[in-house]
Design a protein with these regions (language model features):
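Active-site phosphate/pyrophosphate-binding segments
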Residues: 314, 332-439
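N-terminal leader/propeptide and maturation segments of large enzyme subunits in energy/redox metabolism
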Residues: 116-139, 146, 153-157, 171, ...
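Long, contiguous, secondary-structure-rich segments that constitute the structural scaffold
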Residues: 568-624, 712-728, 732-824
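Short acidic (Asp/Glu) and glycine-rich catalytic loops that position anionic groups and cofactors
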Residues: 288-295, 340-346, 376-384, 451, ...
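Extended redox/cofactor-interaction regions of prokaryotic respiratory oxidoreductases
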Residues: 176-280, 284, 308-312, 397-541, ...
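Short beta-alpha connecting loops at secondary-structure transitions
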Residues: 294-301, 532, 549-560, 714
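N-terminal export/assembly segments and adjacent metallocofactor-ligating motifs
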Residues: 1-321, 357, 450, 457-459, ...
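Glycine/threonine-rich phosphate-binding loop and adjacent beta-strand/alpha-helix elements that clamp
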Residues: 537-559, 574-576, 761
Length: 824
């Protein structure tokens, strides 16, 4: 492992150079990859190394971001050893040469001289009943097809279930979603699918879409141009680091004032303001407090689950003051009066519900919507994330916020918008989902014993679902039935094994589980078949970031063993099913599995993303996706193009910086729709726990750990910081329960219990806790309820529990830092 070394080999001037978009958060920072034979290295003179930097003298500050974590050694399938260096791209408009703690470790997650390499899946693996053994791609695909064929023939498509990602980045991309989606929805035809982070096949933004607006409608540049930025249920410094540092912070410091003056010559402009809506003082709030002051940083420290009341009061106050945009409402919207009446709430009532003072709510409204000295309305950019998405009735909260945006016309103009901040990157291209709305609640279907085969693709619901304890119990119990049947069928043919599995699922209530992943996750180990996937760099992959910017991550190394792209795994499974139906003489079913004759990721991209103008395809590229090719993206580099593409002109793809600048919204009549969203209290299961238990258990991400820690759990640098999921607790509460820093504690309620590592901090209110989400050692989902909104979007953040001290861990006390993470 190269991390922590005191010497870095420089790439020679002729090193291979390719483009790579960071695997991780939605910002999608651009990086350059340098690859060269391991027995060579570049010189210190600028002409002797590929970086063009003079290392013969001290490199000036901020000229280069380079650490030992950004370089490693790999070995390709030809047996040749290479060095790889991955550095941020100074010319990328997304990150402006910045690197986050996640992107800065990209070299550390390659298959090579790295801590993760020995943990990667290299070959398909089969559970023989009492052990896991390697097998071939062909054997694995044939067994999967044989079992799926039996379920389809006996139960129909709804017997085949999927837990499947729907995003871009390391876990997928447009090729991934098309390959898996074509298999699930077109070939198999199932509606029994759920998405990686929620228990049904739905959108996280149904309300925004129903009201006529796609949820990623602004440009990152808008954060530089806004008068006010709202950050609602979002922690951008930790979760969208370089969007925050490269685009928000300069505005808050007043460094974009001249840019605003050039764009908006007649308007009053100044340094930007930011308003946070969050129950805790996050590191993002702390950073902004240090950069700004009380005149441009406001934190509305809201009571949990009360966002709708806050937004309705602001909506009412703005209208009562006459700050709404009457011409925009009249010309481009419908339903205003209904929403105005339904959402009416006074500042005083909202203050009682939310715990935020009347003065603070009024100040937020004045900053954001009161006309400026020039008479112009403020340009206000509204960003939200999991505090709303996983909040108390997703649909209602989101609708109440979008109502404010529509009332004030803050969409489609520079410096405005209503966009989610996002977690991972995006990359959606699939056939239409064949199920209803609301979609089936797949977790509950599995708990009730439905479904016979479950494919877990690029996700791990054990660590990321709600009501996880009951869900995992059902998975283990039902998978165990199949495991026993497979043990008894050892030594037989593929068909005899498939017969045994089918009998166990149909007669005895078992569940056959196949997993496609980079690693043998806890969910995969609970199952019966594992298929090894590849990630960016090992394959070519396209995805788009939070401003709809699509780029091509280029291949620069071989995947390990028989790992391959997810799209090609989907094709392999589909082709195996087609062969079986052809052999059975069922040409009708065989034809459903046709059209998977892909040999590369580019073939899958061309079949899906580039064909939305001819086929019935739901694609973030839209009908103009046909203009996008791998070669054109390769030429566009790390700046890519913002979707939808307008045209290809003079050798360049021309994109769309922000949506709805023409005020033509995504509705039948082109008018945006107000949505009544009255405050309605808490979802029932959560309300019951709130009455019974004293502590609210909030949850979310931290800067150091990405998603379910699928890479990070294998890296000592990460697990040394957080050996167990940290639980922030106010010192007063900690004293009351006898809890010290580093103690192992147990949270418990009617839904289950989980363990965590105590982390005392005054930045969290008494009566509240904050636990890191999705970790492998301590899972907050085990104390969350099954509560969902009308579209089966879960209230992950709605958990109340009690706490007890388990004891002290000497190693935690010795090696883990409990200094404040607020950096100020």
């Amino acid at each position: 492992m190269s991390h922590g070394t005191d010497r870095i080999a420089l790439p020679p001037a002729d090193a291979e150079k390719t483009n790579l978009v960071c695997h991780f958060c939605i910002v999608g920072c651009g990086y350059h990859v340098y690859k060269w034979p391991a027995n060579r290295e570049g010189g210190r003179a600028p002409g002797d190394n590929a970086l063009g930097v003079d290392f013969r003298r001290q490199v000036p500050p901020m000229q280069l971001t380079m650490t030992s974590a950004m370089t490693t050694r790999i070995r390709d399938r030809d047996g040749q050893d290479y060095r790889v260096m991955i550095l941020p791209d100074d010319d990328c408009v997304v990150n402006d040469g910045l690197s986050s703690t996640r992107g800065g470790q990209l070299a550390n997650v390659l298959y090579g001289d790295t801590p993760v390499a020995s943990h990667r899946l290299r070959y398909p693996r089969l559970n023989t009943g009492d052990d896991w053994v390697d097998t071939t791609r062909e054997h694995a695909a044939d067994l999967y097809a044989a079992i799926t064929q039996r379920v389809l023939d006996s139960e129909g498509p709804d017997g085949v279930m999927f837990n499947c990602s729907d995003h871009g980045g390391a876990g997928g991309g447009f090729e991934f979603t098309w390959g898996t989606g074509k298999l699930m929805f077109q070939a198999i035809g199932t509606k029994m699918a759920r998405i990686h982070n929620r228990p049904a096949y739905n959108s996280e933004c149904h309300a925004s879409r129903d009201m006529g607006m796609y949820e990623l409608n602004s440009a990152y540049e808008d954060a530089e141009l806004a008068d006010v930025i709202w950050s609602i249920g979002n922690n951008p410094y930790e979760n969208q680091t370089n969007y925050f540092l490269a685009h928000w912070v300069p505005n808050l410091r007043g460094q974009t004032r001249s840019k605003k003056q050039e764009r908006f010559a007649d308007e009053t402009v100044g340094r930007g303001r930011v308003i946070f809506v969050d129950p805790r003082r996050t590191p993002s709030v702390a950073v902004c407090d240090q950069i700004g002051d009380a005149d441009n940083v406001l934190h509305l420290q809201i009571n949990p689950g009360t966002d709708t009341a806050l937004f309705n009061a602001i909506f009412t106050y703005v209208i009562d003051q006459g700050w709404h945009n009457e011409s925009f409402i009249a010309d481009h919207t419908s339903g205003f009066e209904e929403a105005r009446e339904a959402n009416r709430m006074s500042l005083e009532e909202a203050s009682q519900i939310t715990g935020v003072s009347v003065e603070a709510i009024r100040r937020a409204a004045e900053w954001s919507y009161k006309p400026k000295d020039s008479g112009h309305s403020p340009r206000t950019l509204h960003h939200y994330e999991k505090g709303i998405i996983w909040g108390n009735d997703n649909y209602r909260i989101q609708a109440s916020l979008v109502d404010i945006v529509l009332a004030t016309g803050n969409v489609g103009r520079e410096g405005t918008g209503i966009s989610r901040m996002g977690g991972h990157q995006e990359g959606y291209t699939r056939p239409p989902y064949p199920g209803p709305r609301p979609a089936p609640y797949i977790d509950q279907e599995i708990i009730k014993g439905n479904g016979q085969i479950l494919t877990v693709w690029g996700c791990n619901a054990f660590q990321t679902t709600c009501n996880a304890e009951q869900y995992k119990e059902a998975i283990h119990r039902r998978a165990g039935i199949v495991q026993q049947a497979m043990a008894k069928a050892r030594g037989g043919s593929v068909d005899s094994m498939a017969d045994a599995v089918h009998e166990a699922t149909q007669r005895d209530g078992g569940l056959f589980i196949a997993a496609v992943d980079l690693y043998p996750t806890a969910f995969a180990r609970a199952g019966h078949l594992m298929l090894p996937a590849a990630h960016p760099g090992e394959i070519e992959l396209t995805a788009m970031n939070g401003e709809r910017r699509i780029r091509l991550s280029e291949r620069f190394m071989d995947p390990p063993g028989e790992a391959e792209a997810d799209s090609l795994i989907a094709a392999r499974l589909a082709n195996a099913l087609r062969r079986r139906y052809q052999e059975a003489g069922n040409e009708e079913m065989a034809e459903r599995f046709a059209g998977f004759d892909w040999e590369s990721q580019e073939d899958a991209f061309n079949d899906g993303f580039r064909m939305a103008h001819e086929k019935e395809i739901d694609s973030q590229g839209g009908e103009t996706g046909r203009l996008v090719t791998y070669q054109r993206l390769r030429e566009a580099g790390n700046n890519g193009v913002q979707l939808p593409v307008q045209e290809y002109r003079d050798g360049e793809l021309v994109g769309t910086p922000r949506l709805y600048s023409d005020h033509n919204f995504d509705t039948d009549d082109g008018r945006a729709r107000f949505q009544p969203a009255p405050w309605n209290g808490f979802l029932s299961p959560v309300a019951k726990q709130k009455e019974k238990y004293p502590l609210w258990v909030n949850n979310g991400r931290t800067n150091h750990i990405w998603q379910s820690a699928y890479h990070d759990q294998h890296i000592d640098y990460r697990t040394g910081r957080f050996p167990m999921a940290p639980l922030e607790i106010n010192p007063e509460d900690a004293e009351a329960y006898g809890i010290a820093n580093g103690d192992v504690v147990e949270l418990f309620n009617d839904y289950g219990s989980t363990m965590a590592m105590a982390y005392r901090t005054p930045e969290i209110k008494t009566g509240q806790l904050f636990m890191m989400f999705g970790y492998f050692n301590g899972m907050v989902g085990e104390v969350t309820t099954e509560a969902v909104d009308e579209n089966v979007v879960p209230y992950y953040k709605g958990a109340w529990a009690d706490i007890r001290r388990i004891g002290s861990m000497e190693e935690y006390q010795r090696s883990v830092s409990f200094r404040s993470r607020r950096y100020t």
